[in-house]
UniProtKB/Swiss-Prot annotation:
Residues 28-38 have a biased composition (Basic and acidic residues). Pfam families: Ribosomal_L2 (PF00181), Ribosomal_L2_C (PF03947). SUPFAM superfamilies: Nucleic acid-binding proteins (SSF50249), Translation proteins SH3-like domain (SSF50104). It comes from Cellvibrio japonicus (strain Ueda107). HAMAP family: Ribosomal_uL2_B. This is Large ribosomal subunit protein uL2. InterPro entries: NA-bd_OB-fold, Rib_uL2_dom2, Ribosomal_uL2, Ribosomal_uL2_bac/org-type, Ribosomal_uL2_C, Ribosomal_uL2_CS, Ribosomal_uL2_dom3, Ribosomal_uL2_RNA-bd_dom. One of its GO terms (cellular component) is large ribosomal subunit. The lineage of its organism: Bacteria, Pseudomonadati, Pseudomonadota, Gammaproteobacteria, Cellvibrionales. Residues 28-55, 224-258 are annotated as: Disordered. The keyword Transferase does not apply.
C-alpha cells in the first residue's frame, strides 16, 4: 500500500490523502455474492429521521461476507483481494476445494494464491479460523465471535485486532484495541492475524464533497440553530450555548455514559482506556 498526495491544483486536491493498494482486483465483484442495498436517508418506516447526517451518496451493492467460516476441513484458495464500499477493510474472494466461492474479511498479509482453512484442527496461520481455545496465548486475532456459531462481531474494521491474553475454563480473556479486557466463551471462533488496510486512518478526504459521496450529510452546531431546534439555539449574536453541551433532545454529551447493558457487564474484566 502507498500513501498518495496530490498536487495542490485546487483546495480539495491540496488536502486529499489517499491510501492506494495496487494489489486490489480492478474488475467487477463476484455477482452471485452481491445483494441490493437500498438507501433509507436516515428515515424509518414512518418517514421520520431516526439517524441524523445520513443521506445521498454513491449507489452500492452489498457484498455477502461469510462471518461464520463454517466450512470445516475443506481447504480454500484466495482468488483475489477486493475493495468493499460497505466497510473499511478489504475483502478476499476464496474458492473452496468443492468449488464454492465466498467472501471473507481479508487479514493483513493475505494475498492471491494463499491457502486457508477453518475448523478445530486448522493450522496456526494467518487467515485460518478456529475456536479460541485452540489458539496459543499471545496470538493476535480478529473477527471474533461473541456467541458460538453466530458469526464474527468483534475486530472487523480496517487494522482492527484483539490479543488473547488468558484462558480460564470455559472462557478466554481478550485485550481489545480500545484497551478493554473482555471474556469470551472458549468455543467462539476467531481468525488469526489483524484486519487488512491498516493505513486507513492515515487517509484524508480533502473536501466536503468526498464526505457526501460516502452518504454522510453535514453536522450543524446547536448554537447555530434556533431555540425551537436545539437547547443551545437562539440568543442575540454569538453565544456559548449557556449550558453544558447536550444533544438536540437534552441528553448530556461529551463524556456522558450511555451504556445500558447489565447482562454482559460481568464479561468485561476492565473497561476501555480513557482517551
Amino acid at each position: 500500500m502507498a500513501i498518495v498526495k496530490s498536487k495542490p491544483t485546487s483546495p480539495g486536491r491540496r488536502f486529499v490523502v489517499k491510501v492506494v493498494n495496487h494489489d486490489l482486483h480492478k474488475g467487477e465483484p463476484y455477482a452471485p455474492l452481491l445483494d441490493k442495498k437500498s438507501k433509507s436517508g436516515g428515515r424509518n418506516n414512518t418517514g421520520r429521521i431516526t439517524t441524523r447526517h445520513v443521506g445521498g451518496g454513491h449507489k452500492q451493492h452489498y457484498r455477502i461476507v461469510d462471518f461464520r467460516r463454517n466450512k470445516d476441513g475443506i481447504p480454500a484458495t484466495v482468488e483475489r483481494i477486493e475493495y468493499d464500499p460497505n466497510r473499511t477493510a478489504y475483502i478476499a474472494l476464496v474458492v473452496y476445494a468443492d468449488g464454492e466461492r465466498r467472501y471473507i474479511i481479508a487479514p493483513k498479509g493475505l494475498s492471491a494464491g494463499d491457502k486457508i482453512e477453518s475448523g478445530n484442527a486448522a493450522a496456526i496461520k494467518v487467515g485460518n479460523t478456529l475456536p479460541v481455545r485452540n489458539i496459543p496465548l499471545g496470538s493476535v486475532i480478529h473477527c471474533v465471535e461473541l456467541k458460538p456459531g453466530k458469526g464474527a462481531q468483534l475486530a472487523r474494521s480496517a487494522g482492527a485486532s484483539a490479543q488473547l491474553v488468558a484462558k480460564d475454563g470455559a472462557y478466554v480473556t481478550l485485550r481489545l484495541r480500545s484497551g478493554e479486557m473482555r471474556k469470551v466463551l472458549s468455543d467462539c471462533r476467531a481468525t488469526l492475524g489483524e484486519v487488512s488496510n491498516t493505513e486507513h486512518n492515515l487517509r484524508s478526504l480533502g473536501k466536503a464533497g468526498a464526505k457526501r459521496w460516502l452518504g454522510i450529510r453535514p453536522t450543524v452546531r446547536g448554537v447555530a440553530m434556533n431555540p425551537v431546534d436545539h437547547p443551545h439555539g437562539g440568543g442575540e449574536g454569538r453565544t456559548s450555548g449557556g449550558r453544558h453541551p447536550v444533544s438536540p433532545w437534552g441528553i448530556p454529551t461529551k463524556g456522558y455514559k450511555t451504556r445500558k447493558n447489565k447482562r454482559t457487564d460481568n464479561m468485561i474484566v476492565r473497561r476501555r482506556d480513557k482517551k
